[in-house]
Amino acid sequence: MAFISFPPRHPSSSARLPLTLIALDDWALSSITGVDSEKYIQGQVTADVSQMTEQQHLLAAHCDAKGKMWSTLRLFRERDGFAWIERRSVREAQLTELKKYAVFSKVVIAPDDERVLLGVAGFQARAALANVFSELPNSENQVVRDGASTLLWFEHPAERFLLVTDVATANMLTEKLHGEAELNNSQQWLALDIEAGIPVIDAANSGQFIPQATNLQALGGISFKKGCYTGQEMVARAKFRGANKRALWLLAGKASRVPEAGEDLELQMGENWRRTGAILAATQLDDGQLLVQAVMNNDLEAESVFRVRDDANTLHIVPLPYSLEE
């Protein structure tokens, strides 16, 4: 029996989110297995995976030779290698790039659509899951395994959980939470990632930005001490020569439409508007508010006013839950 996804509804902000079970159809799972898996992935991503424990997950970037990101990967260890979660729209291209040198290593790199990705967030999320699983992850142990399930813990914008599980467990959880939790699709998890300042790289923005332009250094996603990896020279230059002039920003406000990934925004300059930045992701909440995640210049004034191109409404900067100070 397959897992049936949930119908869409407008997402809520983390502050007002009732207990919600979220089908993460817009995200996709992949894995690398084999005796060379750690060495291989270490040579391809920005984070130091050799330092990762079984109880950690981290966000890393997979870059091209120029340091531009194919994708960001949410990495965690599995029994005989690693698994990662990324946006479904970039998975195929990202795996093609990752496999380019695999012929020289004892590894198997593959998409995994057998397992189901679910999010649990909102009011009393921990209590709801405690009725189902014997152990839950937390700030100390961010990854917990329970039977066929791997549970990942997220702190921001409010405590939430990502489940990598089999179809039977996904259906069982849906049944157990029936009547207690609201059901929603990927847009709700996307809204929470936007609030949390976690970069969302979809196909429209793949190959466009170095990791620092999306704040990955502030999220622990770049090691400047590890050995070489694809794109390392450009990523290091951006840090040590101050070559990066961009950052990821969170904007909120109103607009008559939800802009697409890859669109630009407009910045108010006196009585005029100037095109700026690139949108990574946007979603409209159930209260009508628009949330936008965008890469723009890193020296913007906090009071800057923006708008979706040619729109009558405006957007403003919202502080992120982490600091960009190094």
UniProtKB/Swiss-Prot annotation:
Gene Ontology process terms (BP): iron-sulfur cluster assembly; RNA modification; tRNA processing
Compartments in which it is found: Cytoplasm
Binding site for folate: W27, W189
Tree of life domain: Bacteria
Parts of the chain that traverse the membrane: none
Gene Ontology molecular-function annotations: folic acid binding
Pfam families associated with the record: GCV_T, YgfZ_barrel
Gene Ontology terms: cellular component: cytoplasm
Gene3D superfamilies: 2.40.30.160, 3.30.70.1630, Aminomethyltransferase beta-barrel domains (3.30.70.1400)
Keyword set, alphabetical order: Cytoplasm, Folate-binding, tRNA processing
Database matches in NCBIfam families: PRK09559.1, ygfZ_signature
PANTHER family: TRANSFERASE CAF17, MITOCHONDRIAL-RELATED (PTHR22602:SF0)
Family: Belongs to the tRNA-modifying YgfZ family.
Cited function: Folate-binding protein involved in regulating the level of ATP-DnaA and in the modification of some tRNAs. It is probably a key factor in regulatory networks that act via tRNA modification, such as initiation of chromosomal replication.
Designated name of the protein: tRNA-modifying protein YgfZ
Naturally occurring in which organism (per UniProt): Salmonella schwarzengrund (strain CVM19633)
